[in-house]
Amino acid sequence: MAFNVITFLQLAVFVVILFNINLHSASAGSKGQRASQVSETSITAEFCDTSCTQGTDKTWSGCSGDCFCVHVGNDTEGRCMRWDGDYPSAEEEE
């Protein structure tokens, strides 16, 4: 009789563990509700039509208007880029 009770309890624990694993794996990949992608400070970045270069005096030139130069690593050539939106500028934060 004692053997049957222990076997039953082991089986019950095993079923509970399997149920929890199955429940977790089903909910881990679910697409549930997400937070809205819209924020109070929305911003977009886009490339301008011009490129920029670094001169021998280490200053960047070639961008005009609201565009600024973006480059990778030590590269002396880059692309001009512009921010659009209501994101605060560095001057406003200081």
Swiss-Prot record:
Signal peptide: 1-28
Organism this protein belongs to: Ixodes ricinus (Common tick)
An example Gene Ontology CC term for this record: extracellular region
Disulfide bonds: 48-67, 52-69, 63-80
An annotated Gene Ontology molecular function: C-X-C chemokine binding
Function: Salivary chemokine-binding protein which binds to host chemokines CXCL1, CXCL2, CXCL3, CXCL5, CXCL6, CXCL10, CXCL12 and CXCL13.
Residues bearing glycans: 74
Compartments, as annotated in UniProt: Secreted
Protein name as catalogued: Evasin P1086
Keyword annotations from UniProtKB, A to Z: Disulfide bond, Glycoprotein, Secreted, Signal
